[in-house]
Structure formats: C-alpha cells, structure tokens
Amino acid sequence: MEFKMDHQNFNVADLDKSIAFYQEALGLHEVRRNEAADGSYKIVYMSNEVSNFQLELTWMRDHPQKYDLGECEFHLAFRVDDYPAAYEKH
C-alpha cells in the first residue's frame, strides 16, 4: 500500500494577502479554487512545477479576525492507492 502526501491546509484571515505572500516567498501559483455559492468560504490551492504537493488556503467569511495559534483546524492530506486496505489498517 502506498501513501502519498497531497496537500496541507491553513485557514487565513486575508486570502488575497496570503496568496500574494506565497507567490512572492515560494513562487507558488493558484492551481484551483472552490467558492461557496453563499460566499461563506473560499478555498485556494497553490503549487509549483517542482512538486505535486499543494498548499490549501481556506478563507471563512464569518472569521474576519486573525487566527490565534492553535485556534483553527488544519489538516495534512494523503492519497492512497488502496483506500479499503488503508481504512482497514487504521
């Protein structure tokens, strides 16, 4: 069974500022975007040509203030070649 790291999520208070930072600091660019129909969230995935790993930036309309360390959820995602076997293992 093979696990592959897929993406890392960070919640951000200012999506445009965060996108600009990762573009400038790491040379990442937007590869896809998902926005709620009601405008409650926006999710932007960023990457580069060096790796398939993606950075996921999540903006939540109802959380305009800066995030405190440890306050928000985050996740590290993996892709697996045999999901039923991975589920059984874990």
Give the role of each language-model region:
Residues 33, 58-60:
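Conserved beta-strand termini and adjacent loop/short-helix elements that scaffold enzyme active sites
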